[in-house]
């Protein structure tokens, strides 16, 4: 199964970029588990939303993950919405990071394009989640998700 992890675009005139280590850690765990993973750091690559959508289309993942802190949370939802509208409604969308961990119920109610939220540290939860999605198993009793 293919998984894409995305750091959303940022549009600040002056900003200091630092790598999103969380996405790297999650990618390493998923690769260890045999998943084909691509990380897209739209901020570092100066990608627009259109550029991110093209990357998703080219890679054709079954699951996309994004999230982060509150300032980029809506950008993640823009990516999820466009991916489901323009590529496939079957793409499983997963958000994580501080914003979604603390506002999980509100986020799921506000964003219909959001399928799952991983709360807290995501490495092992994402591993279990991806294994279940790949096997077509239910997620109901999976710990660490909303």
Labelled PLM ranges:
Residues 12-23:
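Glycine- and acidic-residue-enriched helix-capping/strand-helix junction motifs
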Residues 2-14:
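Nucleotide-activated donor-dependent transferases that construct or modify glycoconjugates
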